[in-house]
Amino acid sequence: RSLDVARGKITVTAPDAAGLFYGLQSLGQLAERCGRRIPAVVIEDAPRFGYRGFMLDVSRHFRDKEFVKRQLDLLARYKFNRFHWHLTDGAGWRIEIKKYPVLTDIAAWRPYPDWEGWNFGGKRYCRRDDPAADGGYYTQDEIREVVEYARALHIEVIPEIEMPGHSEEVLAVFPELSCSGKPYLNSDFCIGNE
């Protein structure tokens, strides 16, 4: 992979589309630094690591789709190729599941905007129409849009769905699935309660 800047000519060579994309990222960084007059330079490089990843935990701290896309833009700029999207955990369920709308009606919303309030405040979840509701979730179409956006940037999205541990948000809305049959306890899914 190389970027060759000569008088009146810029050449980017790479074995594949991702390599060309990364070469253009390098060119953009040079242009940002040097303005319209990029000095003659030859850059030959390749990634040191095949897996160059970043994890965003939206379960604990929800961020909207546009924020996620801005993060992807930054990852692409620095040639990251994996985006680990932590979508569910005890702190919130962030994916629309049409068969189970109660997951996003309740488990996507907390009555506290900050982590400490949620973690130590007692009440864990609330309905989205609660005046104190803070949180959110991604519709299936928004998830598809983010995945396609990432693909265009040569970034693979790795969704993380915490199961069966770290699933307090699921057990809050489906307590019958826990071994105790009660929500808000440190309990995992009970294999016998399907």
Could you tell me what each predicted segment is?
Residues D57-G90:
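A conserved hydrophobic secondary-structure block that centers on an alpha-helix together
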Residues I10-A14, D57-H61, A132-D134:
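Second-shell loop/turn segments in exported
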Residues D16, L75, V157:
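Conserved hydrophobic/aromatic pocket- or pore-lining residues that grip, position, or stack substrates
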Residues L20, V68, T139, I143:
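Aromatic/hydrophobic pocket-lining residues that form the small-molecule binding cavity
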Residues A91-A152, S167-E194:
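Aromatic- and acidic-residue-enriched carbohydrate-binding clefts of CAZyme catalytic domains
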Residues R52-L56, F83-W85, V157-I161:
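Hydrophobic faces of well-ordered beta-strands that scaffold small-molecule active sites
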Residues R1-Y51:
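Contiguous, structured surface segment used for ligand recognition
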Residues Q71, V146, V157:
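Aromatic/hydrophobic pocket-lining residues that form π-stacking "cages" and hydrophobic walls in ligand
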